[in-house]
Amino acid sequence: KIVLRVSKKTKTQFTSIIEVGGELRSNQGVAFPDSSLSLATLTDKDKNDIEFGNQLDVDFVAVSFVRDADDILNVKKLINPNTMVIAKIELKSAVKNLKSIIQESDGVMVARGDLGVQLPLERIPIIQKEILNESNLLGKITITATEMLTSMISSYRPTRAEVSDITNAILDGTDSVMLSAETSIGDNPILSVQAMANICEEVDETSNKNYLNKKDISVSNELTNSLSKAAVQVANDSNAKAIVAFTETGRTPLLLSNHRPDAPIFTFTTIDKTYNQLNLLWGVEQVKINRLETTDEMFSIANKWLK
């Protein structure tokens, strides 16, 4: 972490004073927390990368340094129709325009590393809760990322504070938690994944799973959401062992997941991309099947698979 303060500038260069020194590695990002830059969110390289991703038919496109909803809409114009857009909330302007950004996105990433540079550190936990709460209310996928198990870059076990951090993110309603440096440059990538998985499983098994059921999830399709909410209520009241959903787009399991049922959600789909995208949803286990023609076939394959 290096901190510079600009002391003099011209149109093409600047002179700075090193306030906090350190090792400067290649390909590192530069943040300007006290400035509003007029740079385009999408560069020519970004557009070329998106085109390459379209050729591969990628499942997700994560958009860095989103400022407003227009940034998301501009990306949607370029990607394949069924590719999901994940907005990375990293800037002050993104926090200011949070609701409109979430509304236009398929999912949101709480990018705490860059947020911690742009905003005072003491505000980050509250902002994280606001992002997750607003995303859950709008029925969007959520990812919490950055510095979750930083100590495990060099240590074989996490700190107590890191365990609490991951636990609170799950209790706040995140669908997914993500590792970064721990697995990309760390000494213990496998141990890091195992530690995070163990924490997630423990929270899911022992916590009050109804902590999100009290929220009124206000997604656009009110009928589908009402049916999903009713299905979860019936499943909870009857102590059902599983909830089964058949889907092509992934919308139904997303809504079911947002209501945090006690039972796991088994989702059957014929679409490869939907199968992959369902990996990010809380409490969902997906099954790839061939196309079925009747509801009798659906009941048959569900019963056969669940046994």
Kindly give the residue locations of the regions a language model identified.
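Non-catalytic helical/linker scaffolds that mediate oligomerization, partner binding
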Residues: 1-307
